[in-house]
Amino acid sequence: MAIALSTLVEEADRYLDAARIQDYCPNGLQVEGRPQVRRIVSGVTASQALLDAAVEADADVVLVHHGYFWKGENPCVVGMKQRRLKTLLNNDISLLAYHLPLDLHPEVGNNVQLARQLGFEVEGPLEPGNPRSIVLLGSLAEPMQPADFARHVRDALGREPLLVDAGQPIRRIAWCTGGAQGYIDQAIAAGVDAYLTGEVSEQTVHSARENGISFIAAGHHATERYGVQALGDYLGKRFAIEHLFIDCPNPA
C-alpha cells in the first residue's frame, strides 16, 4: 500500500503537535522526495550511514530525531551537508525530522519510551507548569543500589554507562534522554536519588557528588533510539505501510 507524502507529514505533525513547540531546528518535512510513500526507514540521526542504508532498503522517507538546518549552523551546502542532501535528492527520498516534539510526546516520546525500556514508573514532568519541560520524574518499582542500577541500564541499552555512585539506594529518579546534563541541579532540587541522561560534563560530576545523588550518563544515542522507533511504528500501523528502524551505532 502507498499513501501520499503530504498525508504522512500532516499526520506526524498533528500527532506530535509540532507547530506548538519552539525548537532549534525546523520540525517536520525538511527535504521533499517522491510524492508517494510505501516504506519508512527510521533512525536517530540523519547521518550518511543511515541515508546509505535507506537507499539500500529502497526507502521513500527517512524519519529521524536529529535532522538538519540547526539554529546557528553554517547554512552553506558544502562538504558533509552537500553529500547528505545529494544522497536524498538523487534518490528522491524525503527527510522527516522531529526534535523536541519527539522528546515531549506522552506516548512515543523519547523520555516515555526510555522509561518503558528501563521499567520506570512515570510521575510526571520535572516542571509541571512548563510546556517545554522535557525532564521526567518517577520511581523504580523496587529500590536498587547504584551499581546494580547501572548494570540494569547496561543490559537494557546495550552500552556501559558512566556512574557517579552516591552509595545510597535509588528509588526516586529523574531522567532525560540525550544531552540534558544541564538539568541536574533542577533534578537535585526535586529531591531525587538519581538523575539519568545521555551525556556528562565535567561539572555534572561535582554537582552529583556534592549533593549526594547518583548520576548516570547512559549515552546520547543509546537513550534516544526508542522514540523514533515508536513514532515509525505508529505511522506504519496508521497507514499500513512498511517501517524499518536502522540503528547506526554511536558510542557517544
From Swiss-Prot:
Q: Gene3D superfamilies, alphabetically?
A: NIF3 (NGG1p interacting factor 3)-like
Tell me which Pfam families the record gives: DUF34_NIF3
Question: Has the keyword Metal-binding been applied to this entry?
Answer: yes
Q: Which InterPro entries match?
A: DUF34/NIF3 (IPR002678), DUF34/NIF3_sf (IPR036069)
Kindly indicate whether the keyword rRNA-binding belongs to this entry.
no
Report keywords, A-Z: Metal-binding
Q: Which GO terms describe its molecular function?
A: metal ion binding
The UniProt annotation places a divalent metal cation 1 binding at 65, 103, 224
Report the domain of life of the source organism: Bacteria
Q: Which residues bind a divalent metal cation 2?
A: 66, 220, 224
List the GO cellular component terms.
cytoplasm
Give the multimer and partner information: Homohexamer.
**Family note:** Belongs to the GTP cyclohydrolase I type 2/NIF3 family.
This chain's protein is named: GTP cyclohydrolase 1 type 2 homolog
Which organism does this sequence originate in? Answer: Pseudomonas aeruginosa (strain ATCC 15692 / DSM 22644 / CIP 104116 / JCM 14847 / LMG 12228 / 1C / PRS 101 / PAO1)
